Regions:
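Hydrophobic alpha-helical transmembrane segments of multi-pass integral membrane proteins
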Residues: 109-111, 137-166, 173, 379-388, ...
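Hydrophobic core segments of alpha-helical transmembrane domains in multi-pass membrane transport
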Residues: 40-55, 109-117, 148-150, 188-195, ...
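Interfacial loop/helix-cap signal at membrane boundaries in integral membrane proteins
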Residues: 21-22, 60-103, 217-230, 310-332, ...
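Intrinsically disordered, low-complexity non-transmembrane regions of multi-pass membrane transporters
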Residues: 1-32, 61-84, 258-289, 537-542
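Membrane-core helix-loop-helix motifs of multi-pass transport proteins
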Residues: 27-31, 164, 168-264, 284-291, ...
Length: 542
């Protein structure tokens, strides 16, 4: 009987596993890097030096895009562009401001947070959180966060700007580590970027690029033709992927990420964080009435939005488009940030009038001002991140790397289903440097779509495989446009948090998603023989 306690003691003394030690090393090495602002500034300067060397060494590759495509040079070459010359210096000096003001996430965050600020000032956001915390089953909270985050990537700005910060607040309110909530939501919004139960704006975009790439070897693939790749080409596979991502994201959060994060230490957080006990207070009668009226307001607004979007002559429909509903509604989908702004402000004013927290226009303006005043560190980070991303794009270094990687893969001369594994892994690698899904696919599709079609696979299946690689490394690359925002939110809960901690936190999701998604792809397409979308063939026959 004495042996059992000794065995338990030996197990208790056992150190962290190999994977945990690996994450600790990643975190340690990552945190040796300087402050994120300094890091982006140094990287921007490094790009200048590398671009000068690249042009001096005459780095160039053949442009895989067909002739006549916008952005393709007349001689069909992609050359490294140096910024270490008079022309480069003038370009930097003239565009320093526009790089910052034109950085995609900046305007999105500023406009959306004006509405969120009013919701915070009125108390609506806090009341909603308390209702969620008090009413939702605790054991389903993580799954709900991941699933909602995956679905939100139909309108990606909403997921990044609203859901990710919200998940951190909710987790803290129920006594869990806020960074675990942030990580779960980030993994859903960005790591599960291609999965969804709805057709999103990225679907027709990628389908158009795939159609043009398939046309290189088969002219029957053309816009408006019978073989045009539809926006629904991957819908069935991505619908099923949503639930796989939810399960994996939930398990990784509860089994790996939360235990590694340990206990939340409020002393390391920002001084202006809300009191976590507020999330556990019972709603007052005025707050309940305010929530009901705010909810009714949202329903009325949704009804009005439907009247503007669904009829054929609706104001939110594109009169020049007569295709899928998702294409007709593109003006509305591109107005998501504006809708977030309005859908936060109007119900917040209604709630504030009922509870007495919003008495006049000054209270509304005060809420907006408070939201803006909290963005100082983020604005500084974005300034330097925007310069780095712009410099990198100007030099063509990312595009050259993508083409070189694609050429390397073609030399393996693989056939059969196994060819998709190195293809997906290559897409994962390229995504670390080209954060835009459309930009990456525009460069690599003209290489891989014709190549894989010649060995017998349809463009629809090739596109589905690409989307796996494009999604799974979004959460571990600083080139992802919203990475700076996520880092700024995370630093509110740990002032000393560095890039290493954030990347180490997200690596388990990235690896797990990749393994799970590749497995699902092979089982769905090759073991079960199911189509990736309605009417999408698996194989291509010339």
């Amino acid at each position: 009987m004495a042996e059992a306690p000794r065995r338990r003691n030996r197990r208790a003394r056992k150190g962290p596993g190999l994977f945990t030690r690996f994450l600790n090393v990643v975190e340690f090495l990552g945190n040796l890097l300087p402050h994120p602002v300094t890091l982006f500034a140094v990287l921007a300067l490094l790009i200048l030096l590398v671009s000068g060397m690249a042009e001096m060494l005459d780095w160039q590759v053949d442009d895989p895009r067909p002739a006549g495509v916008s952005g393709r040079s007349e001689d069909g070459l992609i050359r490294a562009v140096s910024l270490m010359n008079p022309e480069g210096m003038r370009r930097i000096a003239m565009n320093l401001v526009t790089n910052f003001t034109g950085f995609a996430p900046l305007g999105t965050v500023l406009v959306a947070l004006l509405g969120v600020g009013v919701a915070e000032r009125s108390g609506l956001l806090g009341a909603l959180l308390r209702a969620l915390v008090l009413g939702a089953p605790r054991n389903l909270l993580t799954a709900v966060v991941v699933f909602a985050s995956v679905v939100s990537n139909t309108a990606s700005e909403m997921g990044y700007v609203v859901l990710i910060p919200l998940a951190a607040v909710v987790f803290r309110a129920v006594g869990r580590h806020p960074l675990a909530g942030l990580a779960a939501a980030f993994a859903g919004v960005s790591g599960g970027y291609s999965a969804n139960v709805l057709i999103g704006t990225v679907d027709p975009l990628l389908a158009g690029i795939t159609t043009e790439a398939a046309r290189i070897i088969d002219p029957s693939y053309a816009p408006g033709a019978v073989n045009e790749i539809p926006a629904t080409a991957n819908y069935l596979f991505m619908f099923v992927s949503t639930f796989m991502i939810t399960v994996i994201g939930t398990l990784v959060t509860t089994r790996i990420v939360e235990p590694k994060l340990g206990k939340f230490e409020p002393s390391r957080a920002a001084d202006d964080l809300e009191d976590p006990e507020e999330g556990l207070k019972t709603l007052s009668p005025e707050e309940k009435r305010g929530l009901k009226l705010a909810g009714l307001t949202v329903l009325v607004m949704l009804g009005g939005l439907a009247l503007l979007a669904l009829p054929e002559n609706g104001w939110f429909r594109d009169p020049a488009v007569n295709a899928l509903l998702i294409d007709d509604l593109r003006p509305m989908l591109r107005s998501v940030v504006s809708l977030i702004f309005v859908f936060f402000i109007v119900p917040s004013i209604v709630y504030g009038r009922v509870t007495g927290s919003v008495r006049n226009d000054r209270d509304v303006i005060d809420g907006m001002g408070r939201a803006m005043s909290s963005l100082g560190p983020y604005m500084v980070l974005v300034f330097f991140a925007a310069q780095f991303v712009s410099f990198f794009n100007w030099t063509n270094l990312g595009t050259i790397t993508a083409v070189v990687g694609a050429d390397l893969l073609t030399r393996f001369d693989l056939t059969g289903p196994v060819v998709f594994l190195p293809f997906i892994l290559m897409c994962c690698f390229v995504n670390l440097m080209l954060g835009s899904a459309s930009a990456q696919w525009a460069v690599t599709a003209p290489i891989f779509v014709p190549m894989l079609m010649t060995v017998g696979y349809s463009p629809e299946v090739i596109q589905a495989a690409y989307r796996i690689g494009d999604s799974t490394t979004n959460i571990i690359t600083p080139m992802m446009s919203y990475f700076g925002l996520i880092l700024a939110v995370a630093m509110r809960y740990d002032r000393k948090l560095g890039i290493g901690t954030l990347i180490a936190t997200m690596i388990p999701y990235s690896i797990s998603y990749l393994i799970g998604w590749v497995t699902l792809f092979y089982v769905w397409v090759f073991a079960l023989g199911l189509p990736v979308g309605p009417g999408s063939p698996t194989y291509y026959t010339p």
